[in-house]
Amino acid sequence: HKYVVNTKPYYFYYHRGNSITTSTFSKRDFNYIEIYTKFSRYVEEHYPDLHEEMFFRLSYAYFFIFDKLLHVDGYQKLEEYKVVCDYLKQNALKIARNQIFQKGRRLAALFLKVNVRLYRFVMLANERKTKQIH
């Protein structure tokens, strides 16, 4: 098997509505975390020097799913919510120190550590701002 991990931002995405990345949460989306968890174990075992990059990728997968969950009415009641939220809160300081994450995402991790509602408020405000740009 051959894997390549790269975290350098070579380009910017324009997110279309109703694409896979912008659709609402479904239980299938949790596969994204499961895949990156398996990938992370492999990388940690065979390429431990890529620990920071792999932590970034795995944590990003959790953020991706968490952001989707926060758009669901009654998200607090979903079983996936607790798993994802717990991971991000437990790793918030490590995320905040990881220089691969953009500054905004590092700050968001700290907001989440303080309060999920604060994180959600900032996330939704950022989404509204981004939609105005496009």
Region annotations inferred by a language model:
Residues 45, 71-134:
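Membrane-interface aromatic/basic loop that binds lipid-linked glycans or pyrophosphate carriers
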Residues 40, 44-47:
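A conserved position within tetratricopeptide repeats
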Residues 30-34, 49-57, 79:
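Residues within HEAT/ARM-like alpha-solenoid scaffolds
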Residues 3-35, 72:
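Nucleotide-sugar-dependent glycosyltransferase catalytic core
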Residues 55-68:
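Amphipathic alpha-helical repeat scaffolds of TPR domains
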Residues 4-6, 53, 96-98:
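General small-molecule cofactor/ligand-binding pocket signal
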Residues 35-38, 61:
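Amphipathic, well-ordered alpha-helical segments in soluble domains
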Residues 22-23, 48-49, 75:
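Short, surface-exposed loop/turn segments at secondary-structure junctions
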